[in-house]
């Protein structure tokens, strides 16, 4: 049996956050690693989705091309995945020759088979900008709750919208009211496949039940699908009037085009009737219908392609019991996480916290507690005490005659074998939480056995060998089963054991034991909490200003030179720095301005150490009204720049007298 495992294509308008990792990429990698562990033939295919309005909007906002945005975030996403140890056999992009060619072939075949037709629709057109407006180019008020809404979605009430439903619509480029014009679009005759899709979903034995149920509900009211857009960025529709394919008809075709990058072997997974293969898609639950209904419909329409065997739909991840929001920066980015903590800790926590098909929450407190009291106190404790004791007594895993083992030894080894069987079943059912809990239970059994045997009190060397052999065998099973979840930490344990990733005990010399699982410190968790809260406050302020500007059509306010000269900016030098007692973020800083010293309260704690600040030249606003922060008076402000959470104080590039005025 050959396996093809795919992950939902990451959208190249931003980097990855923990929600992406939890729903899709980590579980897919765990599943792939386990199949490899069992010596099964498996390819892991993924990539990025590079077309659609959000990318063109971001490019326009930044004054760059869509390809610039795609290149930037394709690379950033791949770096994020690499940092989580998520590996691929093929990682492609939809803005590539092989994908565009494959997508156009699919479209032509659908048309030849009678599944594509033309239809006149109504859509917004902006006279001022001389362009048709795709859904994301229009904003206004939601017709249901009157909240601020995009042309396709209301963030307030969560409803899907059509652009023409909006109240008080306006073009996001010029803020003018668009008019409705008629346009010819191309539609996919999905409604004709109702019976075929119902039969496919009903008979898909490995499809999770919640995915089946959602798909069957949608199929009941199946309607045709507008698959063209009046845009220039995308996969061109052959022989059309300059339109491109809607991303949700061309993006899933990436699973085929990216497999093609492996060579002719791609046919074994997608076409060949002579090769047994299974296709498993890992996705987030927000795109379940696209993969369980729309994508199978496309495959049915082109004919001769194999159908997905399973669509594994991961639930949503909230953050501190609130919905994640990239626009509000209420999110933990993968890059920020791995700079502080082991990616293995994230892989473990996100899988053990809840069944994959259910929504769950990421909280910094729960993360710390689960890692410290479960992973480290149970698995880490058993592994460390076993290796320390065995290395000190024997220098290697002792060799024993299996028929001399006592019943209590055999009982634990049989538990290892039984756990392996249960674990296999759970992984193949995508039940990663319960699979990890089996490892935890086995580790508890190991700890209980170690404690009951009291190896430190055993005087018979042969009996001690049997006990430590049993402990090391149990540890080998734990490492083997845990390896798909925590490839780095288990690799370090195997290195100490001088063993291979299998269930055989070779009895090689052990290396000097060291602590593999280190506890999460309170200060590190506190810093991540403070970073999250400070960023959300900043984003809320920016968002409020942007919304006001949108409503009024306002641009950035320009000021006269006289206004600027009212600000008294001077060069100073930091003399003293101490903590503000009532604050976790503030320093009390004494600055020398040449002819006087000022006391300034600044939120630089966490960005600069005390030693870094003392003696540093700084730029000071000297004519601010004094203000009290945490009960301490501040007589000015230091100037600093901030980007992506990095703070940098403004400085001067040559020696100049303290107190010098900045013009």
UniProtKB/Swiss-Prot annotation:
Q: How is the cofactor bound here? A: Binds 1 zinc ion per subunit.
The UniProt entry's GO biological process terms, in alphabetical order, are: methionyl-tRNA aminoacylation
Task: Report the residue ranges where the short sequence motif 'HIGH' region is annotated in this entry.
Answer: 10-20
- Write out the annotated subcellular location: Cytoplasm
Kindly state which reaction or reactions the protein catalyses.
tRNA(Met) + L-methionine + ATP = L-methionyl-tRNA(Met) + AMP + diphosphate
**What positions carry the motif 'KMSKS' region?**
323-327
List each copy of the tRNA-binding domain by range. Answer: 563-663
Q: Does the keyword Protein biosynthesis apply?
A: yes
Q: Where does ATP bind?
A: 326
The main location class comes to: cytoplasm
Any S-S bridges, and between which cysteines? none
User: Quick one: signal sequence residues?
Assistant: none
Q: Does the keyword Methyltransferase apply?
A: no
Question: Which Enzyme Commission numbers does its entry carry?
Answer: 6.1.1.10
InterPro entries, A to Z: Anticodon_Met (IPR041872), M/V/L/I-tRNA-synth_anticd-bd (IPR013155), Met-tRNA-synth_bsu_C (IPR004495), Met-tRNA_ligase_1 (IPR023458), Met-tRNA_synth (IPR014758), Methionyl/Leucyl_tRNA_Synth (IPR015413), MetRS_core (IPR033911), MetRS_Zn (IPR029038)
- Which keywords are on file for this protein? Aminoacyl-tRNA synthetase, ATP-binding, Cytoplasm, Ligase, Metal-binding, Nucleotide-binding, Protein biosynthesis, RNA-binding, tRNA-binding, Zinc
Cofactor entry: Zn(2+)
The EC class name is ligase
GO cellular component terms listed in the entry, alphabetical order: aminoacyl-tRNA synthetase multienzyme complex; cytosol
What residues bind Zn(2+), as annotated?
A: 142, 145, 154, 157
What superkingdom does the record give? Archaea
An MF annotation (GO) of this entry:
ATP binding
Self-association and partners? Homodimer.
Q: Name the protein family.
A: Belongs to the class-I aminoacyl-tRNA synthetase family. MetG type 1 subfamily.
Write the protein's name: Methionine--tRNA ligase
Source organism (scientific name): Methanococcus vannielii (strain ATCC 35089 / DSM 1224 / JCM 13029 / OCM 148 / SB)
In the UniProt record, what gene is named as encoding this protein? metG
